[in-house]
């Protein structure tokens, strides 16, 4: 859950990007389904949920860091209710979007995303089965909340097979440093942005 105040931080960050009214309206479609708590964040957003603002900020960061052209095969570890998939699709026409999550969460994501016309195929996985040739790997908090054995499985089966990685951790600097040290074996690592919203958590 994202608080009203956290939503204000995301809204402020989003203003660094150039977005028009049509794009904002397409982002706000997220709130049509599921009875989201929406609040007035003023211009240019109007009434929008804090959770959608977080997804918008994530999607715009991904677009800024990695571009929108070469993201045909996207993987998300821990897909929430499917909101980030929907939001990214406002910016990027992907071919495949794989979501790894628990079975109950996968059913929720399928139901939510069925209300929208998503460009590309959304594929759900309830086990960390191996996947190759991933253009972009995303994890907002979920990876850092896994136990060590599951982290190993996800890293070896999925993360290291990814060309680009966008990951936010919520277990503080130790978790972040452990992951970065490991990633240096398989990636040319550059930390593009460090957001410390709620010390000592919330590192990107």
Each model region followed by its residue ranges:
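S-adenosyl-L-methionine
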Residues: 111-131
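Conserved class I S-adenosyl-L-methionine
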Residues: 70-80
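Conserved beta-strand signature within the Rossmann-like core of class I S-adenosyl-L-methionine
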Residues: 162-173
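A short SAM/SAH-binding and catalytic strip from SAM-dependent methyltransferases
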Residues: 137-149
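A short, conserved alpha-helix within the catalytic core of class I
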Residues: 146-158
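Conserved Class I S-adenosyl-L-methionine-dependent methyltransferase catalytic core
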Residues: 1-69
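Conserved SAM-binding loop of SAM-dependent methyltransferases across substrates and taxa
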Residues: 81-92
């Amino acid at each position: 859950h994202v608080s009203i105040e956290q939503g204000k931080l995301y809204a402020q960050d989003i203003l660094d990007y150039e977005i028009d009214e049509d794009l904002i309206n397409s982002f706000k479609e997220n709130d049509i389904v599921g009875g989201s708590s929406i609040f007035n964040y003023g211009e240019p957003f109007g009434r929008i949920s804090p959770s959608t603002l977080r997804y918008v900020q994530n999607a715009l960061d991904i677009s800024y860091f990695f571009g929108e052209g070469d993201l045909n095969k996207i993987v998300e570890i821990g897909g929430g209710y499917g909101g980030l998939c929907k939001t990214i699709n406002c910016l990027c026409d992907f071919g495949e979007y794989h979501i790894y999550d628990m079975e109950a969460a996968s059913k929720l994501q399928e139901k939510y995303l069925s209300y929208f016309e998503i460009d590309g195929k959304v594929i759900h996985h309830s086990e960390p089965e191996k996947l190759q040739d991933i253009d972009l790997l995303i994890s907002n908090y979920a990876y850092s909340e896994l136990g060590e054995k599951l982290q190993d499985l996800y890293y070896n089966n999925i993360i290291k097979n990814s060309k680009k990685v966008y990951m936010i951790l919520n277990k503080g600097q130790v978790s972040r440093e452990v992951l970065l040290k490991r990633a240096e074996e398989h990636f040319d690592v550059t930390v593009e942005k460090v957001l410390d919203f709620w010390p000592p958590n919330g590192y990107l």
